[in-house]
């Protein structure tokens, strides 16, 4: 009898933990979607509401105010900034997304965002679309860490700020 009770208790705890993990993962997916949907509306406050107070974006700038500076600069430089989530994978406290990011260069960057290559650069008026991978780490239902891999050189080429790579026929 004792074995049966212990087994039932253990199964209940394990099932509860699995359900909690599933609930947390689903919640994290929803927060990630909200974060990028807010981005598409240039809704900085909506984005900041999804972050922990000490959230890190590549380690700096730290916290919500650091994110606010970055987001202000992105939306000034690219007022039509758009992120399309193409694919999302979530497990536990991590959500990874493959995205198409686009925008039109209409403002002057003031802080080193997007690899720092647009600081002080006059707007080209040109549109870009590149691929990004975003990895979000969550703590207590909020984004605590944001890592991204971007095609900054591809963006700069599309904006006309970096020459195209040499082709075999013209590289001699």
Sequence positions of predicted segments:
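C-terminal and inter-domain tail/linker signature
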Residues: 19-172
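Bacterial N-terminal signal peptides
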Residues: 4-14
